[in-house]
From Swiss-Prot:
<keyword id="KW-1003">Cell membrane</keyword>
<keyword id="KW-0472">Membrane</keyword>
<keyword id="KW-0963">Cytoplasm</keyword>
<dbReference type="GO" id="GO:0051015">
    <property type="term" value="F:actin filament binding"/>
</dbReference>
<protein>
    <recommendedName>
        <fullName>WD repeat-containing protein 1</fullName>
    </recommendedName>
</protein>
<feature type="repeat" description="WD 4">
    <location>
        <begin position="138"/>
        <end position="176"/>
    </location>
</feature>
<comment type="similarity">
    <text>Belongs to the WD repeat AIP1 family.</text>
</comment>
<dbReference type="InterPro" id="IPR015943">
    <property type="entry name" value="WD40/YVTN_repeat-like_dom_sf"/>
</dbReference>
<keyword id="KW-0206">Cytoskeleton</keyword>
<feature type="repeat" description="WD 10">
    <location>
        <begin position="432"/>
        <end position="474"/>
    </location>
</feature>
<feature type="repeat" description="WD 9">
    <location>
        <begin position="358"/>
        <end position="408"/>
    </location>
</feature>
<dbReference type="Pfam" id="PF00400">
    <property type="entry name" value="WD40"/>
</dbReference>
<feature type="repeat" description="WD 12">
    <location>
        <begin position="523"/>
        <end position="561"/>
    </location>
</feature>
<feature type="repeat" description="WD 1">
    <location>
        <begin position="4"/>
        <end position="45"/>
    </location>
</feature>
<feature type="repeat" description="WD 2">
    <location>
        <begin position="48"/>
        <end position="87"/>
    </location>
</feature>
<dbReference type="GO" id="GO:0005737">
    <property type="term" value="C:cytoplasm"/>
</dbReference>
<dbReference type="GO" id="GO:0003779">
    <property type="term" value="F:actin binding"/>
</dbReference>
């Protein structure tokens, strides 16, 4: 293969305030699972930089859970589709697909022999279903709750018991198979968010929005007590997870803490304080082997440290909203990837290890649309919050003084030499020098969309929705229209000069990439066809002979300048999501980002 997926830096869990986030583990204890959008993310618990992404659902996925055998994963989405798929092969072949009810699936549980599966959620006619995994035949009826069911679990020892937790403040208890409703437990005064049997089957824990955790006998369903007396947490409890030996319980709460409970002593042995901000609310947790994980409202995954409860061992950061733009900074033989997302976050990633963090301080408050680097190690970004920001790559800290307010919303930014930056706003081209606006062109007869600056001559190429590239030159503190426009096949979506300045590549809405020869008076060098939908991004390789383009067709093409037919096609680079931006780390490594909030690196080999 001329290309190979080298690394995947996965997205964070997609979270919603006041809604529990289910994060599950595998039976062997090596991986953990969560969902974001239409993707199921499988990550190595020891080294989270190792990730695999399953994107076959047509609708956003809510929950995914390994079968106890470890060979299959069941995942459920907002439309009520349940997919059961293979974990042993990279292709993740679909084994079975069911529609237990029409509506959002909120939780899934397997029996310990991996033969029966229970599914609950927001069905229209019913809130749950329990059936054989291979035929779909019913093995009981889930009744007893009169509102949406949030959580389900099945006792992993015989005789089987099944329990559900619902928005009607009740848990329903079932015996089976076939599973029959026995009684409800109406101890909670608010929604029940999570119900879990202990691994040995002796106990059942239920956690609710009333801040209470009730314990029941796993076999009979009789109430045994409630953890911590009257209240276990000061806020709603979204998740609980048992230790492997069934003696302790981990809980996650909206009061921004997680706690470890000694079940026999009925007391909290460790309290993890995870911050004071709203984004520090804890929505999910997982206890797997020696690892204690919790999920914050920010989407961050915290590895909790029993020995130091005030500080997590590590925090996995990243994006959980679509990534809009990226750039790469190479220094001292190391590559750093900078990414900007739909919610205004900017992250920087070590391209080798995947270690990443976010800039500190108060930054953009809305979508980061474009970014570029200047020669003094600053990241220049423009955002829908109507600002252009200059952020030092050494301090990685937002400074309020380094922000330039625009009159209208900026869409694209390009950096030239000598402190010049050109920003395209809606109906406007603005020239900045040394972080100050010095010139603007307001009376445009076209809508500017993309901009690039020739590093040598200072020529500014502006791509318009009118299907032309308009050329300007920077003269002192002004922009002069060169009176020359280069026609392409459709509305310009992106453009880029090669690193040696010899060529200009332009992508357009009509699926075409056009390359112009700069030295030859911007004559058309070649036209490249291949995309099946609008091309959105283009980036040159450091060798100046190859360039990559991406489109709404989820394709990435790597083109050879001298031979338009010698193309490398990377289909489904980010499955079901278009690739929003590209950047080369070196002559053979291409990085891509997408609306799936993931960063991928590809090794490209040329003949």
């Amino acid at each position: 293969m001329p290309y190979e997926l080298k690394k995947v830096f996965a997205s964070l869990p997609q979270v919603e305030r006041g809604v529990a986030k289910i994060i599950t583990g595998d039976p062997k204890g090596n991986n953990f699972l969560y969902t974001n959008g239409k993707s199921v993310i499988i990550r190595n618990i020891e080294n989270p930089a190792i990730a695999d992404i399953y994107t076959e659902h047509a609708h956003p996925v809510v929950v995914a859970r390994y079968a106890p055998s470890g060979f299959y994963i069941a995942s459920g989405d907002t439309s009520g589709k349940l997919r059961i798929w293979d974990t042993t092969q990279k292709e993740h072949l679909l084994k079975y697909e069911y529609q237990p009810f029409a509506g959002k699936i909120k939780d899934i549980a397997w029996t310990e022999d991996s033969k029966r599966i229970a599914v609950v959620g927001e069905g229209r006619e019913k809130f749950g279903s329990v059936f054989l995994w291979d035929t779909g035949s019913s093995v009981g009826e889930i009744s007893g709750n009169i509102k949406v069911i949030n959580s389900v679990d099945i006792k992993q020892t015989r005789p089987y018991r099944l329990v559900t937790g619902s928005d009607d403040n009740c848990c329903a208890f079932f015996e089976g198979p076939p599973f029959k409703f026995k009684f409800t437990m109406a101890d909670h005064s608010r929604f029940v968010n999570c119900v879990r049997f202990s691994p040995d089957g002796s106990r059942l824990a239920s956690a609710g929005a009333d801040g209470q955790i009730f314990l029941y006998d796993g076999k009979t369903g009789e109430k045994v007590g409630n953890l911590g007396g009257s209240k276990a947490h000061d806020g709603g409890i979204y998740a609980v997870s048992w230790s492997a030996d069934s003696t302790q319980l981990l809980s996650a709460s909206g009061d921004k803490t997680a706690k470890i409970w000694d079940v026999a002593a009925n007391s909290a042995v460790t309290t993890f304080h995870l911050g004071t901000e709203v984004l520090d609310q804890q929505l999910g947790c997982l206890w797997q082997k020696d690892y204690l994980l919790s999920v914050s409202l920010s989407g961050y995954i915290n590895y909790l440290d029993k020995n130091n409860p005030s500080r997590p061992l590590r925090v996995i950061k990243g994006h959980n909203k679509s990534i809009q733009c990226m750039t790469v900074h190479n220094s001292d033989g190391r590559s750093t990837i900078y990414t900007g997302s739909h919610d205004g976050h900017i992250n920087y990633w070590d391209a080798e290890t995947g270690e990443n963090d976010t800039f500190t301080g108060k930054g953009h408050t809305n979508q980061v649309s474009r970014m570029d680097l200047d020669s003094s190690n600053q990241l220049i970004t423009c955002s829908m919050d109507d600002t252009v920001r200059y952020t030092s790559l050494t301090s990685k800290d937002y400074s309020s003084s380094e922000s330039v307010k625009m009159d209208v919303q900026p869409k694209c930014v390009a950096v030239g030499s000598g402190g010049y930056v050109v920003t395209l706003c809606i109906g406007q081209i603005v020239l900045l020098k040394d972080k100050k606006k010095v010139f603007a062109i307001d009376s445009l007869d076209y809508e500017p969309e993309a901009v690039a600056i020739h590093k040598g001559s200072g020529t500014v190429a502006v791509g318009g929705v009118d299907g032309n590239v308009h050329l300007y030159s920077i003269q002192g503190n002004s922009l002069k229209d060169e009176g020359k426009s280069l026609p392409v096949k459709g509305a310009v979506t992106d453009l880029a000069y090669s690193h040696d300045g010899a060529f200009l590549a332009v992508t357009d809405a009509n699926k075409v990439v056009t390359v112009f020869n700069v030295a030859d008076g911007y004559s058309e060098q070649n036209v490249y066809y291949g995309h099946h939908a609008k091309a959105v991004s283009v980036a040159w390789s450091p060798d100046n002979e190859h360039f990559a383009s991406s489109g709404m067709d989820m394709m990435v093409y790597v083109w050879t300048l001298s031979d338009p037919d010698a193309r490398i096609k990377i289909p489904d680079a980010h499955r079901l999501h278009h690739v929003s931006s590209l950047a080369w780390l070196d002559e053979h490594t291409l990085a891509t980002v997408s609306h799936d909030a993931c960063v991928k690196q590809w090794t490209v080999t040329f003949k």
